[in-house]
């Protein structure tokens, strides 16, 4: 392995940080040794209508967990009501930036409160009650945040479906969660192009076995040509919310801490969507506490998480974490490349963003564009950077740190999952020294362990690798797969008894820092040696010609598995044998000869989901010469990428 660099927080950041290293160590110790005491104290960060009867009740072996049972609270009350009787009433809650740079809007806490109350009453008027599901299929506009907060106000369970998903993907989610009502828009904009939404809902409902009686439509594009309207089912949002007879106040429903809050679907390996179910009290406490410490939030900060609310990052760190802390949260409808590759930097400059949280995929794409766009903008307001979604390779980390953060902004490289609800392993800026590429140390209450394939904990000192599991419950963890308790147990608790299995592999270094090596099915077993795909990818992108790389295993006659690398080069770089040799050499240098790629496949681009994750399942099949039965590809941003890779592979074979 290359020598690890340690980056210390600056003296100034350290001085003003929300937590010190000493406090982190003592609080972490308490959170593991006495979780009941620790979480009872931290739960006071929220406003409760009634105190719980017991902090924690669990049987991890049988996947049973309850936090704050009997405690009563309401999420929208914690995000809105408790702020509007304070000076936060007129503070910006949501700063909305449209796809087109000419469109923007600022909503104060009172603005959001007023709109949420009115829309909650609309939902009630159309028969939505506590426990009913509301499916939300909207672009990144303020009404999306307003809708989910209105659901929480009346105790309805929201299920947000990313606006880029197809009618088929939408239908499968409708069939699974059986919504009482759907909220959508006439359409949306993404990268200057219109996107279909209402039409997709119409198609999905036509094919669905569910009889959804009400569809509420937000006017976003104003383009009604081709819009099919079903009287008695379809209603305009703006007409309903501006009804003069609508009460301006909706009393927040008193919810048990364990009442369901939302369902969020993730891709399952079987192709059937997996509805991750989160509950009210533990989830809200998890996102509230992590937001405060991980992002070192201050009252005057402007914070921007670039994620879509269709993904868990948008739920936790665009809406619920920031608003429950009384922060100002930027909400962006567009893409980083429109109208040009300087758009992210424009938004930071325009709003004086202090904290910026984005994905390595975006960082690598912007890195590929060079410095021109960055140098034209003023990024001096930034004081903290974050990364989410996948491990960030050290080269991208260094670029982010030096070019965007000007070597003064710590980077929080956060590891967590849709299933965990909130950040699990991370640096705490100002307290914990960072190592580029490492997710760092566990957050309070999180007890990660590495286990071998027989389920035995690996407790050796020094550097070790294994399957990343969590040993004990944490408040924001998922409570089930919606409507399928067997699948919940089988997926997360059956492989290693008594542990929550994350599905990821990791190594722990001599300092206790965790390095995520990729999904366990992304671990390649070469001649009995376990090679993490993320490690090989990191080595490949150290070469200045490489923009991005994805590495998978494929059947090898001698080694069992060989290493197959898909490599995308930067603009203007020629692909040739000389570059191939350089790439093999750099992998040998950084990891060792055992990790040298057997095949380098030049890829103009990689197949990604709309949230930016590389679909490795498809890459593995292509590498193995399996071109049929690629499984569910409905989440792909650009299906033509797959076709091109298959054509290239066929040529390579012939």
UniProtKB/Swiss-Prot annotation:
Molecular function terms from GO: acetate-CoA ligase activity; AMP binding; ATP binding; metal ion binding
Binding, ATP: 389-391, 413-418, 504, 519, 530
A Pfam entry, by short name: ACAS_N
GO cellular component assignments: cytosol
Residues where N6-acetyllysine is found: 613
Residues bound to CoA: 190-193, 313, 527
Disulfide bonds: none
EC class (word): ligase
Function in brief: Catalyzes the conversion of acetate into acetyl-CoA (AcCoA), an essential intermediate at the junction of anabolic and catabolic pathways. AcsA undergoes a two-step reaction. In the first half reaction, AcsA combines acetate with ATP to form acetyl-adenylate (AcAMP) intermediate. In the second half reaction, it can then transfer the acetyl group from AcAMP to the sulfhydryl group of CoA, forming the product AcCoA.
NCBIfam families, per the entry: Ac_CoA_lig_AcsA, PRK00174.1
Protein family according to the UniProt entry: Belongs to the ATP-dependent AMP-binding enzyme family.
Protein's name in the database: Acetyl-coenzyme A synthetase
Organism per entry: Leptospira borgpetersenii serovar Hardjo-bovis (strain L550)
């Amino acid at each position: 392995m290359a020598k690890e660099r340690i980056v210390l927080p600056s003296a100034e950041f350290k001085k003003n940080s929300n937590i010190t290293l000493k406090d982190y160590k003592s609080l972490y110790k308490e959170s593991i040794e006495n979780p009941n005491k620790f979480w009872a104290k931290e739960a006071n960060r929220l406003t409760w209508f009634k105190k719980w009867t017991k902090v924690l009740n669990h049987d991890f072996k049988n996947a049973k967990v309850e936090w704050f049972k009997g405690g009563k609270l309401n999420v929208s009350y914690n995000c809105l009501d408790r702020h509007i009787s304070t000076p936060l009433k007129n503070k910006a809650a949501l700063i909305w930036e449209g796809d087109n740079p000419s469109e923007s809007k600022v909503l104060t806490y009172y603005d959001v409160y007023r709109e949420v109350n009115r829309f909650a009453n609309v939902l009630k008027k159309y028969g939505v009650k506590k426990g009913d599901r509301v499916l939300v299929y909207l672009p990144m506009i303020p009404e999306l945040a307003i809708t989910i907060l209105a659901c929480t106000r009346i105790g309805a369970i929201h299920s947000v479906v990313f606006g880029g998903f197809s009618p088929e993907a939408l239908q499968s989610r409708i069939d699974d969660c059986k919504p009482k009502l759907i909220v959508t828009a006439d359409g949306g904009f993404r990268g200057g192009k219109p996107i279909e939404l209402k039409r997709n809902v119409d198609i999905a409902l036509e094919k669905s076995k569910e009889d959804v009686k009400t569809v509420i439509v937000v006017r976003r594009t104003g383009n009604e040509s081709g819009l099919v309207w079903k009287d008695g089912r379809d209603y305009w949002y703006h007409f309903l919310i501006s009804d003069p007879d609508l009460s301006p106040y909706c009393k927040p429903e008193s919810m048990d801490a364990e009442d369901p809050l939302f369902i969020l679907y993730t891709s399952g390996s079987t192709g059937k969507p997996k509805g991750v179910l989160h509950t009210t009290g533990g989830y809200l406490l998890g996102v509230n506490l992590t937001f405060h410490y991980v992002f070192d939030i201050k009252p005057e900060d402007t914070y921007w998480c670039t994620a879509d609310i269709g993904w868990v990052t948008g739920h936790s760190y665009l809406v619920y974490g920031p608003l429950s802390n009384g922060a100002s949260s930027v909400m962006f409808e567009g893409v980083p490349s429109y109208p040009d590759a300087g758009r992210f930097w424009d938004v930071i400059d325009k709003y004086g963003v202090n904290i910026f949280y984005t994905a390595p995929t975006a960082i690598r794409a912007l890195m590929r564009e060079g410095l021109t766009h960055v140098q034209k903008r003023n990024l001096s307001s930034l004081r903290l950077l974050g990364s989410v979604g996948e491990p960030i390779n050290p080269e991208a980390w260094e670029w982010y740190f030096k070019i965007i953060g000007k070597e003064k902004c710590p980077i929080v490289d956060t590891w967590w999952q849709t299933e965990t609800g909130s950040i699990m392993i991370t640096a705490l800026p100002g307290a914990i020294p960072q190592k580029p590429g490492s997710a760092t140390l566990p957050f309070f209450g999180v007890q990660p362990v590495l286990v071998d394939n027989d389920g035995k904990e690996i407790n050796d000192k020094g550097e070790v690798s294994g399957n990343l599991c969590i040993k004990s419950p944490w408040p924001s963890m998922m409570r089930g797969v919606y409507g399928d308790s067997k699948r919940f147990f089988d997926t997360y608790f059956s492989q290693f008894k008594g542990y929550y299995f994350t599905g990821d592999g990791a190594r722990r270094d001599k300092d206790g820092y965790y390095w995520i090596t990729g999904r366990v099915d992304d671990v390649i077993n070469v001649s009995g040696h376990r090679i993490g795909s993320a490690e090989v990818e990191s080595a490949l992108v150290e070469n200045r010609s490489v923009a991005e790389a994805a590495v998978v295993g494929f059947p090898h006659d001698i080694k069992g598995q060989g290493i197959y690398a898909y490599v995308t080069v930067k603009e203007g770089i020629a692909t040739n044998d000389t570059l191939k040799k350089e790439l093999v050499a750099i992998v040998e240098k950084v990891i060792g000869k055992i990790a040298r790629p057997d095949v380098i496949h030049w890829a103009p681009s990689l197949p990604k989901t709309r949230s930016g994750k590389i679909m490795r399942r498809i890459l593995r099949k292509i590498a193995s010469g399996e071109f049929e039965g690629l499984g569910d590809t409905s989440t792909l941003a650009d299906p033509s990428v797959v076709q091109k890779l298959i054509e290239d592979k066929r040529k390579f074979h012939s």
